[in-house]
Amino acid sequence: MAIKDWPEGEGPRDKLLVKGAAHLSDAELLAVLLRNGLSGLNAVDLARSLIHEFGGLRSLLCAPKHQVCRLPGVGPVKYAQLQAAAELARRVAQENLQRGQVLTNPDLTRDYLMRQLADRSYEVFAILLLDSQHRVIQFVELFRGTIDSASVYPREVVSLVLEKKAAAVIVCHNHPSGIAEPSQADRRITERLKNALATIDVSLLDHMVVGDREIVSFAERGWIN
């Protein structure tokens, strides 16, 4: 049944306007963005099929254009709408870690890194630069590709830290496999970076590894002394 034929107030857009977005299911929120479905499928049905196909909203929004647009009912326009929504979410997260904000809430940092790095199809190694009061200076993506002890150059990290006059840093990278458990290579990278930063009297506060649904903190495991 087409959504326009549903009882008044039951459509996802009407429900959002009356009850608020928090009362909508994932499929209903997605249907608001999609606006319409295709023959035999209304927008909510199409949204459910997309979520099922990709295994969740995050995987759908991070999927490349060719994977999304090959599905019936989703062309370049709908793909663009989804990407705009995903980018808005990233920018909201970015505003939550504004320059000058003091990092007193570990959950805020985790949420930010999860939004920035989870579900990337390639590895990204990044650094969160902080001043002596642990206020945010900048978040910088340094390396992309296969991240191992040979591809992360401590001298580039040190150079950036000196350029930005950072007093402390948090480094992070993602695992495209979705499993956040650190590897031995991750531990070697961390040790090399900690030693390099110590030569310029800068503290490595943490190394966070981002998976699909969790973040592993080296500091919480006692791996950074």
Curated annotation (Swiss-Prot):
Gene Ontology molecular function terms on file: metal ion binding; metallopeptidase activity
Cross-referenced InterPro entries: MPN, RadC_JAB, RuvA_2-like, UPF0758, UPF0758_CS, UPF0758_N
Pfam families: RadC, UPF0758_N
Domain MPN: 102-224
Gene Ontology BP annotations: proteolysis
Keyword Metal-binding on entry: yes
Binding, Zn(2+): H173, H175, D186
Keywords recorded for this protein, A-Z: Hydrolase, Metal-binding, Metalloprotease, Protease, Zinc
Motif (JAMM motif): 173-186
Gene3D superfamilies named in the record: Cytidine Deaminase, domain 2 (3.40.140.10)
SUPFAM superfamilies listed in its UniProt record: JAB1/MPN domain, RuvA domain 2-like
PANTHER family in alphabetical order: DNA REPAIR PROTEIN RADC, UPF0758 PROTEIN YEES-RELATED
Assigned protein family: Belongs to the UPF0758 family.
Protein name as catalogued: UPF0758 protein Shewana3_3770
The species this protein was found in: Shewanella sp. (strain ANA-3)
Top-level taxonomy: Bacteria, Pseudomonadati, Pseudomonadota, Gammaproteobacteria, Alteromonadales
